[in-house]
Amino acid sequence: MKTFNLPLLVALFYLFVSVARSQGPIDITKFGAKPNADATSALLAAWKEACAAAAPAKIVVPAGEFLLNAVKLQGPCKAPLTIEIAGNFKAPADVAQMKGEDTWVKIENVQGLTITCLPTGGTFDGQGQAAWKQNKCAQSGMCNSLPYNFRFNTLTNAQISGIKSLNSKLYHMGVMGCKNITLTGLTIDAPKDSLNTDGMHIGRSNGVHATNSKIGTGDDCISMGDGAVDVHVEGITCGPGHGISIGSMGKFANEAPNTGIFVKNCSFTDTDNGVRIKSWMNSFEASASDLHFEDITVTNVLNPVIIDQEYCPYNHCKEKTPSKVKLSKISFKNVHGAAKSAEVVKLLCSSAVPCDGVELADIDLTFPGGAAVSQCKNVKPIVTGKQNPVACGAPATPAAP
């Protein structure tokens, strides 16, 4: 009499069910996407199917040029999800066609997202040239009236690689409320005179790695707002733009602290700033600590190393009381190269809450036009290694707006 191995049968049954549930790649052309035509509804349909899949799913964007209007790709999804992009997308040039949306491509509330762009694809052209003329930030101080290229909101365990973001109407990328997210191999590009086209803005996120990317914009290559914790920025080539900035801090009440930020092995060419920490005058109380900048190379940079606690762009500060943002445990190590101005180091700290625990180590910065100077105010840094120019050789003067 034959006997049956019940545990084996049960295992085979569940294996069969798992295989039955799995599916091949979900190609957006399955939903009607065609090159040189609008792929918005097709991408949304592909996302809906992939997000509902019980097993890990993959969305495929084949080679070709596609038009894309504003999309929201929202979770939660039932399983991890991958988007593989061989094609390229263009946004509407006319911002009115985006119907008031604050973002071109918004992805949010997803665990286990992977975006991989093949060498031939992954270009997202925001076509921001016309929109930049509508930017009234300098006049009104209202700087969020145009859409980002991307917002990555509340993503957990995400891997994003190879995106090429061009000509965003406002910021290229926002990373908000994320946990354990890596963004690598990015190309971010907009002209140096494009207003407020920050390459990447990180806020209220924990465990962010931004690595091995080339960023050239009309604003900060990377900026970090409040609540940026355990952020690692490494291997970034920045220029043109305004450098890599922590802040501006203190503009709003109840900002979350910034802590554990590491910027390493980055180079800056033809930028307004290199590495910068900034907080508003007449600010609310806030804090930032454990901020470290190391192995920094500058070429023709206006302010290679700067702490600016008298930040007030466009002269919009009605009062000019000292900043209440407390800065502590900060280091600048192995910073070298040639500056565009004589003021190569400017540590302009608040008189209300002077900076604590600032370290300058192995600074070698020159100004081809004459003698370089290191300026300090309301700070007594710890100085080690080579110091060219002499650390804190002059009092700090206000930074250029």
UniProtKB/Swiss-Prot annotation:
Gene3D superfamilies: Single-stranded right-handed beta-helix, Pectin lyase-like. It is found in: Secreted; Secreted, Cell wall. The keyword Cell wall biogenesis/degradation applies. The active site is at D219, H242. Glycans are attached at N180, N265. It catalyses: [(1->4)-alpha-D-galacturonosyl](n) + H2O = alpha-D-galacturonate + [(1->4)-alpha-D-galacturonosyl](n-1). GO terms for cellular component: extracellular region. Its EC number is 3.2.1.67. GO terms for biological process: carbohydrate metabolic process; cell wall organization. Residues 1-22 form the signal peptide. This is Probable galacturan 1,4-alpha-galacturonidase SALK6. It comes from Kali turgidum.
